[in-house]
């Protein structure tokens, strides 16, 4: 972002982040608040969804594993990419887009995402703590958080809590936008939903 500001002086810099990238984008906007003119967070991971395991317990277990040197071990039920994900179990609301990206992912190792580890969960805890305790106080640009209606990957309550904190600062234009019919991967929605999503952005 700093390089973009140097190469294109005078132009507004809009920061967009999705999922875990949304949480990271929020931290970036807090770290250098005067750099950004807009912040757009799509299904942001303010905190991952660990249900049915309570969040405090999940963090405690992750900390113990990390202290014991097991940060690279996968969480229960998680495994490396194997290309067998089914549409019915996915975070996509459009089967056509799901199949399109699944084919691309199968051919390019760099697109193949692995599952969550104990180390990842512990770092997610640190991210959540930073966002809810410090970062929200420093964000100064207009912010839009897009929340999926059928979200299962990240905590909707934490998204709402984060927006409420931003709104406490009267000079901040922060809004939560609920996207009907969508799942976590909003870019894999049906054409009508996706068009409305991009129009609002």
Model region roles, listed by residue range:
Residues 141, 155-165:
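Short alpha-helix in the alpha/beta-hydrolase fold that links the catalytic acid
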């Amino acid at each position: 972002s700093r390089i973009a500001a140097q190469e294109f002086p005078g132009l507004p810099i809009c920061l967009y982040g999705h999922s875990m990238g949304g949480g990271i984008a929020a931290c970036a906007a807090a770290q250098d608040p005067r750099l950004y003119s807009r912040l757009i967070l799509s299904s942001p991971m303010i905190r991952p969804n660990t249900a049915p395991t309570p969040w405090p317990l999940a963090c405690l277990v992750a900390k113990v594993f990390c202290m014991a040197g097991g940060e690279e071990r996968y969480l229960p039920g998680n495994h490396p990419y194997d290309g067998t994900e089914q549409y019915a179990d996915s975070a996509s609301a459009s089967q056509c887009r799901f199949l399109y990206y699944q084919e691309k992912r199968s051919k390019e190792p760099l697109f193949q995402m692995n599952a969550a580890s104990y180390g990842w969960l512990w770092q997610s805890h640190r991210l959540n703590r930073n966002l809810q305790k410090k970062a929200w106080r420093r964000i100064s640009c207009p912010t839009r958080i897009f929340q999926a209606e059928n979200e299962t990957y990240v905590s909707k309550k934490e998204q709402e809590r984060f927006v409420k904190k931003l709104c406490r600062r009267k000079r901040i234009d922060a809004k939560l936008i609920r996207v009907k019919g969508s799942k976590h991967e909003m870019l894999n929605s049906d054409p009508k939903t996706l068009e409305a999503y991009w129009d609002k952005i």
